Structure formats: C-alpha cells, structure tokens
Amino acid sequence: MKYPLYLGAVAAALGLALAGCQPAARPPTVGSSASVPGPSSSELAAIIQTAVEDRNGTVLDTPPVARLATRQMTAAYRSKRERDLAVVARSKAGFKSMGFWYTSFSTTVTVESVEVSGSEASVRFKELTEEYQASTANGPSSVPSGYSLPQTATFRASGDGWQLDSIAPTVHGGILPMSVVEG
C-alpha cells in the first residue's frame, strides 16, 4: 500500500515546483486599466453638455460664466479653450461691426458611442444647437439659426475622475459655427 502514498508525494512535489514558475504578484501600475474605474455614459455626456454650452456661450453678446469645473478638464483642454476665446472674440467683434449679435442659444448633445481603453475614453456625439440673433436694423429675431455637428470628445482618467481632454469636429472643412475653432 505504499503506492498511493508515493503518488501523493509526487503530486505535492510537482505542485511546489510549479508554484515556483508563477510570476510574482504585483500591484497594478498607475494608469493601468485595473486601477481606473470605467466612466458611465451619463457622466461623460453631462461633462460634454456643460463644455459645449460653455463654448457656445462665448458667442453671446454677454457671455455667461463658464460652468465646467477645472477638475473636469485637463490642462491641454483649458489651454486650447483659452486660445479659442481670442479667436471667438475677434469673430464676434466682426459680426457685431456688421450690426449682428447672438442673444441666446439652446444646445442638445446626443451621445452616439463611448469607447474606453484603460485610462482613456473617446465619445462620439452629435451637437444640435439653435442660436437666436439680433440686429441693429431689426432688433431681436424670433427665428433661430441652427446647426448639427458630429464631434468626438476625448477624456483621460485622473485622481479627480474623468477629465475632458479635447472636443473636435469629426467632419473637417466647410463652415463651422463661430464658437467652434478647429485646430
């Protein structure tokens, strides 16, 4: 009856030998997909909606205070937004010198897809905006002008959650709304 005892000893030795072949367990590295909780589509959509409304508000005669929190955007997004403000201000001044200005707008963002890869996310969405104008000749108009613009927003995970890194049109060329500065 030494045979079953012999098999048990061989199995134990084999188990110990194979255990030595396993890689050492390490904690996940910062930025790996294991350390970043995935964003919800509604969380990203809310950030996009606020960012697009902030951007569109820059064309108004009296722009509202931006509502997107600093912790919700990367330094790269903040930098581009600051550069874009100067371009929009020049366009707005030219528009006003011709006797026109925007008085209000209404924007709806519809998320079409969300892709998450580790600490980065990409959101394809469509913006539908109606803008109301006024002119020195006719006063305020009750008929809006409008546009629909497909865009992509990118996000990066950070210690503060998911931060907006960029928003760009997915179709290039053509005439863009005054608030959208490409490049």
Predicted regions and their residues:
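Core segments of small alpha/beta cavity-forming domains
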Residues: 32-104
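Bacterial signal peptide processing site
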Residues: 22-24
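Terminal and domain-boundary regions
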Residues: 39-40, 112-114, 158-161, 165
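Surface-exposed, charged secondary-structure patches
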Residues: 90-138
